[in-house]
């Protein structure tokens, strides 16, 4: 009997030790692997704006004349090169209007546009040649240079309270889109054939250096693009009249976009589109755009799957959205996956804003979108749904790459007027999974929510037109 008691005591002791070790391991894991909003402080610690030498390089000292007519392209080239060779500093755009072609930045250069300074980009498309390594709608190609461009550089900035004006309009760039409201007319050249060709090249895995567009073709460049760069700051400037996407970092890391004003109503005039980027902060910006205000991307179709770099750890704080197709958007070019997106303390309000949170995809894109967080967002009027997750975007369900969307958390979001509160539509074979809404109020809703193929939709303290859901 004593032997049995002793054995029991050893068994109990071993069990207690096992439980204690399990608790210690669990606690340790919880402390080192934060989830949800608890991840934000650690991400913010990794996002550090670059610092620059206290040296100024005024473009007028390199031949620029600010009368809005003189071609200052070479003055910008010389100023950027001198700043770079000196170890970095600021390239100063003083008072005046400075006409230029493409500006290519180099490491340790801060392009600083003073309060009375304006950069005017040329309406001559040849000023954006030779072609550079870039992306058009999520596909790699050699095309017209983005208006401000950098490739494989680090410690870069665009700052100052001045204006950067792309001068795109219905006579230049915009009319390459087949839409009469943007100046296109029957018989004029347009982007459709080139766009289809690039899609085929990407799907056929044609080498990028053989995907040459530019002169004689009609794919528009982006406004600002940093490609494979790190340690970036864009702050205080105002952007106007872009050919298409405004701020478009690709394969970048450690980027801050702060207190930027974007007012541009052309076709595909998205405000800020991080693509395959990591550790990005978009804070206190104003968006009034012709397309999505912020759209997070990771490559389109075959190219996105080939490169396979997700966008992740992107924080959006304190922004104001007016016109646009969506306030915070993911997709549709997201074949390389998107995860860990945090949007908080934003205001969205315009009858010309379609949605507050939008995830758009289809079975040509594929990809996984997960861990999307939105809280403390005030929505006035949107014309469509406050929250829209839609698997039938554009081409619809015609591909072989079934998308996955899961873990979407929405808290303390209110709206005054919309067509729908929620429009959630996944596939039967791939339902939208785990959508959590808490403490939300959607008023002035005209139609019942559309919810199809959604698994684990949970609503706590959610009111639609005053009724608890």
Regions found by a protein language model. Give the residues of each.
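Bacterial N-terminal signal peptides that target proteins for export
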Residues: 2-16
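Extracellular/periplasmic carbohydrate-active domains that bind, remodel
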Residues: 14-469
């Amino acid at each position: 009997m004593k032997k049995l008691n002793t054995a029991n005591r050893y068994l109990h002791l071993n069990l207690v030790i096992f439980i204690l070790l399990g608790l210690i391991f669990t606690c340790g894991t919880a402390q080192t692997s934060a989830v949800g909003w608890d991840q934000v402080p650690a991400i913010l610690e990794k996002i550090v704006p670059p610092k620059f030498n206290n040296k100024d390089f005024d473009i007028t000292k390199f031949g620029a004349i600010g009368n809005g007519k003189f071609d200052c392209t070479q003055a910008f080239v010389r100023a950027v090169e001198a700043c770079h060779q000196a170890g970095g500093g600021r390239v100063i755009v003083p008072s005046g209007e400075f006409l230029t072609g493409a500006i290519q930045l180099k490491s340790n250069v801060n392009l600083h546009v003073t309060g009375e300074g304006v950069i005017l980009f040329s309406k001559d498309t040849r000023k954006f040649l030779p072609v550079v390594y870039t992306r058009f709608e999520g596909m790699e190609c050699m095309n017209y240079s983005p208006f401000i461009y950098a490739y494989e550089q680090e410690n870069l900035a665009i700052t100052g309270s001045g204006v950067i004006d792309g001068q795109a309009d219905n006579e230049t760039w915009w009319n390459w889109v087949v839409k009469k409201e943007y100046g296109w007319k029957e018989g004029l050249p347009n982007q459709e054939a080139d766009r289809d060709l690039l899609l085929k090249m990407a799907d056929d895995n044609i080498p990028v250096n053989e995907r040459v567009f530019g002169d004689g073709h009609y794919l528009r460049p982006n406004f600002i693009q940093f490609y494979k760069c790190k340690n970036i700051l864009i702050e205080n400037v105002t952007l106007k009249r872009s050919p298409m996407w405004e701020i478009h970092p690709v394969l970048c890391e450690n980027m801050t976009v702060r207190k930027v004003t974007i007012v541009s109503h052309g076709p595909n005039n998205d405000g800020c589109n991080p693509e395959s980027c990591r550790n990005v902060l978009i804070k206190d910006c104003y968006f009034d755009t012709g397309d999505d205000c912020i759209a997070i991307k990771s490559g389109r179709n075959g190219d996105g799957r080939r490169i396979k770099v997700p966008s992740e750890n992107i924080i959006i704080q304190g922004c104001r959205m007016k016109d646009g197709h969506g306030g915070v958007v993911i997709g549709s070019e997201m074949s390389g996956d998107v995860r860990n997106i945090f949007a908080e303390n934003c205001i969205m309000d315009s009858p010309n804003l379609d949605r507050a949170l939008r995830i758009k995809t289809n079975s040509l894109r594929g990809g996984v979108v997960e861990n999307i967080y939105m809280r403390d967002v005030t929505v006035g009027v949107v014309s469509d749904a406050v929250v829209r997750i839609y698997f039938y975007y554009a081409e619809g369900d015609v591909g072989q790459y079934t998308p996955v969307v899961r873990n979407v958390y929405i808290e303390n979001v209110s709206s005054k007027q919309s067509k729908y509160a929620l429009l959630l539509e996944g596939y039967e074979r791939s339902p939208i999974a785990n959508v959590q809404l808490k403490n939300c109020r959607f008023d002035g809703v005209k139609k019942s929510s559309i919810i199809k193929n959604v698994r684990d939709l949970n609503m706590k303290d959610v009111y639609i037109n005053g009724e608890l859901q």
